[in-house]
A protein has these predicted regions:
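Conserved donor-binding/catalytic core segment of Leloir-type glycosyltransferases
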Residues: 4, 157, 197, 201-220, ...
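Aromatic "clamp/platform" in nucleotide-sugar-dependent glycosyltransferases that forms part
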Residues: 296
């Protein structure tokens, strides 16, 4: 089986969705599926340094890149659209990752023209909260082709049941399937640091710390997490604790976070570590006492699963769609997005090393049972087979 994966960008700065598609293709190839990623060279305001217009390797999997010609938000690429129009018929199924992007609309249009079934993974963008952000632009896209793209899909791939429920109830969609994302446990687990060319990669902080490992974006709830954490560490018993922000975002927003920390006199307690990849990312995860993901909306939360795979408990909001599974497994703390409640939860987390160890162990078991890439790849193969046999893209 040949499956084409189309995504607007795979640059690390875009967080979990970009990383997940590379890991997904790697896992699919392990179970015998031939994959190719088609994407753009977008990397924020810059561009990835990579060959364009011909097959190359990215993250160890085959990929073909095209220039983003304009619009960081829309990532318009006429060369990508032309390539899709000529090549989608070479694949059994096309898996489209994202919705409000030129690459996605172009892929769906090419599939409909060629009679190739396609599956859409909306990345949480069909959640009512997400649709309410920059809503005028999304309404325009909706009428320009997003609704037709969704109606023509052989399946809509959600990564958590609440994501499916919210999208289907608010938009009247059907053909939904739930297949979670996975983690490559072997790439994360280890001792206190990765061994690399004879040296150990240290965690980003020698003091005990809570880790944020994601894009620095308004939806992540950092406007509440930062003051809650800084209030907590004013207590003498928590004075040595740090909050490590391992991520990047738009310059103006990151600067606003720095100002927030400065106004509260928290510079000694908050570390802006920047985006971490590879061995440094694994070391940061394993060294953390807990990971915080206090989002206003999170369709999956790959960084939380990565933390649990390392035996690190998580503090999440109810708006992280994995929160019910985390709570049921006893793998962390689910806290309302209210300043006082979040402050109390952080104090509970920091004060009880035994609880952190128990919840971390429960999290590791949850990942073993639910988030193995091998098992997930086989679930995806079933989705592709049904899509190929029962449904072709609408013309």
């Amino acid at each position: 089986m040949r499956v084409l994966h189309v995504i607007p960008s795979v640059a690390p700065r875009y967080g979990g969705p970009s990383r997940a598609v590379v890991d997904m293709c790697r896992a699919l190839r392990e179970v015998g599926v031939e994959t190719l990623i088609a994407t753009t060279d977008a990397d924020g305001e810059g561009r990835l340094t990579i060959d364009l217009g011909r097959e190359t390797s990215f993250g160890g999997v085959p990929a073909v890149f095209f220039p983003r010609q304009w619009s960081e938000a829309y990532k318009y690429s006429r060369p990508l659209a032309r390539w899709l129009g000529s090549h989608v018929r070479e694949f059994d199924v096309v898996h489209i990752h994202a919705v409000f992007s030129h690459a996605c609309l172009a892929a769906a249009k090419a599939c409909r023209a060629s009679g190739v079934p396609y599956v859409i993974r909306p990345l949480g963008t069909l959640d009512p909260w997400s649709l309410g952000q920059k809503s005028l632009r999304k309404k325009l896209f909706w009428h320009l082709g997003v609704r037709r793209m969704l109606d023509g899909a052989a399946a809509i791939h959600y990564t958590a049941r609440p994501e499916q429920t919210l999208a289907e109830e608010s938009l009247g969609l059907g053909r939904g399937v739930v297949v979670p994302l996975g983690v490559e446990v072997g790439s994360l687990n280890g001792a206190s640091g990765f061994e690399s060319q004879g040296r150990s990669v240290e965690s980003p902080c020698r003091s005990p710390y809570v880790l944020v490992l994601s894009r620095l974006h308004p939806k992540k709830g950092l406007d509440l997490l930062l003051p809650a954490f800084l209030s907590t560490v004013k207590r003498p018993e928590f004075a040595e604790w740090k909050l490590v922000l391992a991520g990047d975002g738009e310059g103006e927003y990151v600067e606003s976070l720095r100002r927030l920390v400065g106004r509260q006199g928290g510079e000694a307690h908050v570390i802006f570590a920047g985006w971490l990849e590879g061995e440094k990312r694994g070391a940061a995860l394993r060294g953390a006492a807990a990971l915080a993901l206090t989002s206003y909306q999170e369709n999956f939360g790959l960084c939380a699963v990565e933390a649990l795979a390392c035996g690190v408990p998580v503090v999440v909001s109810p708006h992280v769609n994995l929160a019910p599974e985390i709570e049921a497994a006893g793998a962390g703390w689910v806290t309302p997005l209210e300043l006082d409640a979040l402050t109390r939860t952080l104090a509970d987390t920091l004060s009880d090393a035994g609880a952190r160890a128990r919840r971390g162990a429960a999290g590791r078991e949850l990942v073993r049972r639910r988030f193995s890439w091998e098992a997930i790849a086989r679930q995806l193969v079933s989705v592709y087979e049904v899509s190929r046999q029962e449904g072709h893209a609408s013309s």
